[in-house]
Amino acid sequence: MANVLIVYGSTTGNTAWVAETVGRDIAEAGHSVEIRDAGQVEAEGLCEGRDLVLFGCSTWGDDEIELQDDFIHLYESLEATGAGKGRAACFGCGDSSYTYFCGAVDAIEERLSGLGADIVADSLKIDGDPRTMRDDVSAWAGRVVTAL
């Protein structure tokens, strides 16, 4: 049984829904899952004792990449603390009409890769309401479980 942490930042509830759905799918596969809001965690020690950390963040801003407010402190702290060096994968919700569709997901994954994280699955990028893409969310969770 693997120990998985899912950390997310969500303003409208869409990314939170994805975090909860992915967490439920991973737990149903027999793994231990903890889901935390990014505003309630610190980067220091984030990956310690975890087999995998999933990072979920919605993207805001049309002309530049803006991470969801609760996620900014964690994102900025990852490099300073050296956290984020374990196994990871990223997901998020956005709007494909924006210049940088799900740009926060790309920024987080790039930061983690730069810190030496092992990215175990391609990122999941949801356009709009994730509830209409339940099969895609579950398929991604399945790929994550396979990587465990």
Curated annotation (Swiss-Prot):
Residues 4-145 form the Flavodoxin-like domain. The keyword Oxidoreductase does not apply. Gene3D superfamilies: 3.40.50.360. Coiled coil: none annotated. GO terms for molecular function: electron transfer activity; FMN binding. The keyword Zinc-finger does not apply. Its cofactor is FMN. PROSITE patterns: FLAVODOXIN (PS00201), FLAVODOXIN_LIKE (PS50902). Belongs to the flavodoxin family. This is Flavodoxin. It comes from Nitratidesulfovibrio vulgaris (strain DSM 19637 / Miyazaki F).
